[in-house]
UniProtKB/Swiss-Prot annotation:
Orotate binds at T120, R148. The keyword Glycosyltransferase applies. Pfam families: Pribosyltran. Its EC number is 2.4.2.10. 5-phospho-alpha-D-ribose 1-diphosphate binds at E116, D117, I118, V119, T120, T121, G122, L123, S124. GO terms for biological process: 'de novo' UMP biosynthetic process; pyrimidine nucleobase biosynthetic process. Keywords: Glycosyltransferase, Magnesium, Pyrimidine biosynthesis, Transferase. Homodimer. It catalyses: orotidine 5'-phosphate + diphosphate = orotate + 5-phospho-alpha-D-ribose 1-diphosphate. InterPro entries: OPRT (IPR023031), Orotate_PRibTrfase_bac (IPR006273), PRibTrfase_dom (IPR000836), PRTase-like (IPR029057). Its cofactor is Mg(2+). It comes from Bartonella quintana (strain Toulouse). It comes from the Bacteria. This is Orotate phosphoribosyltransferase.
Length: 192
């Protein structure tokens, strides 16, 4: 599966939106990849996550103990990817604004791959790495369905992206005029 295949799946699900969006990262964009529109279709989700699992297998030869997803956005892709890898899926969730591995205990040194839906700045992955290291995990890599940075983001561990697709985003104080004129919509899940 390549980048165009991923984009085609998003198009098939009518999941590429245009307007003025405030991303989960806080940055602004004229394009929003509404992964919920994809994830509501089990067949499309299965295709993406099977492709991601295959890419993870090609990239990581050593044993992986767990796949971990950051709640909320990473829950579905991490679970489905873990199913294709044949290993357990766990998640971190926010407690007082900070990710914690709340519902699970892992053995010290457990080899973990973080799976996320879409990466823009990589903040959720970096926060997930911190939570997992605090829980004793060895985070060997992270993975995502779509890297919006086009491969430029640094998440602190290797990032395996099923697709890299650079979508321009802006700081709130650097919006182009045509974007600033549109009302902003914030569809993300960071503060839920």
């Amino acid at each position: 599966m390549n980048t165009q295949d991923v984009i085609d799946i998003f198009k098939q699900a009518d999941a590429i939106l245009e307007g003025h969006f405030i991303l989960t990262s806080g940055r602004h964009s004229a394009i929003y990849m509404q992964k919920a529109q994809v994830f509501m279709h089990a067949d499309l989700t299965e295709k993406l996550c099977r492709g991601l699992a295959e890419k993870i297998k090609r990239s990581i030869k050593e044993k992986i103990d767990y796949v971990v997803g950051p709640a909320i956005g990473g829950l579905i892709p991490s679970y489905e990817t873990s199913r294709h890898l044949g290993i357990p899926s766990l998640w971190v969730e926010r407690v007082n604004g900070i990710f914690e591995l709340r519902r699970f205990k892992i053995k010290n040194g457990a080899r973990v791959v973080i799976v996320e839906d879409i990466v823009t700045t990589g903040l959720s992955i970096r926060e997930t790495v911190e939570a997992l290291v605090a829980a004793g995990a060895d985070v060997v890599a992270s993975a995502c369905i779509l890297d919006r940075s086009g491969g430029k983001v640094d998440v602190g561990v290797p990032l395996i992206a099923l697709a890299e697709y650079e979508i321009v985003s802006y700081a709130s104080d650097a919006l182009p005029t045509e974007l600033a004129l549109l009302p902003a919509v914030k569809p993300g899940s960071r503060n839920i």
